[in-house]
Amino acid sequence: MAINTSNLCSLLFLLSLFLLSTTVSLAESEFDRQEYEECKRQCMQLETSGQMRRCVSQCDKRFEEDIDWSKYDNQDDPQTDCQQCQRRCRQQESGPRQQQYCQRRCKEICEEEEEYNRQRDPQQQYEQCQERCQRHETEPRHMQTCQQRCERRYEKEKRKQQKRYEEQQREDEEKYEERMKEEDNKRDPQQREYEDCRRRCEQQEPRQQYQCQRRCREQQRQHGRGGDLINPQRGGSGRYEEGEEKQSDNPYYFDERSLSTRFRTEEGHISVLENFYGRSKLLRALKNYRLVLLEANPNAFVLPTHLDADAILLVTGGRGALKMIHRDNRESYNLECGDVIRIPAGTTFYLINRDNNERLHIAKFLQTISTPGQYKEFFPAGGQNPEPYLSTFSKEILEAALNTQAERLRGVLGQQREGVIISASQEQIRELTRDDSESRRWHIRRGGESSRGPYNLFNKRPLYSNKYGQAYEVKPEDYRQLQDMDVSVFIANITQGSMMGPFFNTRSTKVVVVASGEADVEMACPHLSGRHGGRRGGKRHEEEEDVHYEQVKARLSKREAIVVPVGHPVVFVSSGNENLLLFAFGINAQNNHENFLAGRERNVLQQIEPQAMELAFAAPRKEVEELFNSQDESIFFPGPRQHQQQSSRSTKQQQPLVSILDFVGF
């Protein structure tokens, strides 16, 4: 068989290249040493001793530069670099000069590792590592190896820091859950039993859930728990306590567990209330709104951000400062309790607690724009949480946009690792709030023609006031910044044991939150009356429904809320051991009025003609007039407990105020 000579030569050549490539890595170190010895032999042939010394020095330098230092670099654990380097020097470098040079380089690696470990911040570690590479390495190949080692260490430290941050977050969440469980355990055991029963019902099929929940409610009623509106601690089958069972399935009531933590650090937290429309379709009027609560420690700084939603801020406690960026203009305002200010969507803003002792409390009412009931924050600065939005862009884009180098980007972006709310020194706080004194505060003026600054509710006369309470409100017609959102802001201070109402809003639906104290709330609701009302003759026409109002009850503590829909009569009672402080945000606020159903003044029922009242109530005119004219106060009244005490001391018999509700068939 004939063999093509050229093909055979090609095959032999390729085979020789393959054998050479497989042996070169094994013989690399030996080849380097032979080359080094050959270099020195050639030096010995030179004529003068000076030339010989310079030649040998060049051989030494050439050999040192050819050492592959990547084999002494541990990619996974920098802590072992030092130990492995020394061990490999002893094993792989045979010549005394090479041993000496190798050991010297290992010593540098060890010192580098000690200095690296002393510095806790990964970014500073990285920068110092890069400086050492530039200081000690002159050969490009060695410089690249050193820089790659810096990169690997930096990435590993970032992963470790992120892991520590996530562990801290989990620990904080676990503590929060434990606290909520402790609060649950403090409640009445029978109430917990009822809630457990309802949770078991939720696991059943939909058609079985209703009957199951009815059994839970019936079982709860049969326990016959004590207490009533006048004295919740009293035994017996009082009216008020039996209403607590309704609180758990009350679509208008939001307890503290309805607040989810958006951000939490050692310096404060930001919580957002459950989506209104997600809770119940009865709250569809609020589907574009969210409520956010912020608490910040003294001398705390809240990172700059902007929202994809319009926001109204109400300061409910403490003293702060607000910075807003409108295009290329910065506005600065000192904030005090009672201040109201609007932040338009897309406006970058940041907050400072300028008080040394008191926490800053702010409520934010958001009107969403992009997705109904959903909003997002956008932070230009941050680290792991929040992540800065600038870090989303590619390195090339940022270098071009900011006209800078990658090293400077790395030194700035992503370095804030303490979270959204961080601590600032008093000197930093003074510097941040220095120009706030130059910003004029809101001057109360009808229509708000002159300023975008804050409006303070307490700088105007109370809307309603007597010895039982005070109420303050700012409406869109008072403050121009509220007109676009058509939102009002309301604050009421009800003295201990007193009450406000009953009353209803003519146009506005309000979200009412307890800032301090405790509140007992009763509200008449026609939408939950299906369990009691019915359709006559089985007819399905809406106009033939029986009219019935469900009595909605709730007991509110601090940070808990209730929604009062438009037209729903409602009463707030200060039931705790201190005054009750409420604040509220109302939508559809323009031309809204509170219509009161009791009291000497502003009582709409008193304006009805006596003959009409007699016909409507089917009772003698005198009895009707005495009933609705017996209250000497207006808006705020003595509460049920105070009224009972006054009645027991008085020789004149008075009809209890709560009987008004019974009188109208509540």
Swiss-Prot record:
Coiled-coil residues: none
ATP-binding is among the record's keywords: no
CDD domains with a match to the protein in the record: cupin_7S_vicilin-like_C, cupin_7S_vicilin-like_N
Location(s) in or outside the cell: Secreted
Biased amino acid composition, Basic and acidic residues: 239-251
Keyword line: Allergen, Antibiotic, Antimicrobial, Fungicide, IgE-binding protein, Plant defense, Secreted, Seed storage protein, Signal, Storage protein
SMART domains for the chain: Cupin_1 (SM00835)
Domain Cupin type-1: 271-410, 455-625
Signal peptide: 1-27
Predominant cellular place of this UniProt entry's protein: secreted
Family under the similarity heading: Belongs to the 7S seed storage protein family.
Function description: Antimicrobial peptides 2b, 2c and 2d have antibacterial and antifungal activity against a range of species.
Protein's UniProt name: Vicilin-like antimicrobial peptides 2-2
Organism whose genome encodes this protein: Macadamia integrifolia (Macadamia nut)
Upper classification of the organism: Eukaryota, Viridiplantae, Streptophyta, Embryophyta, Tracheophyta
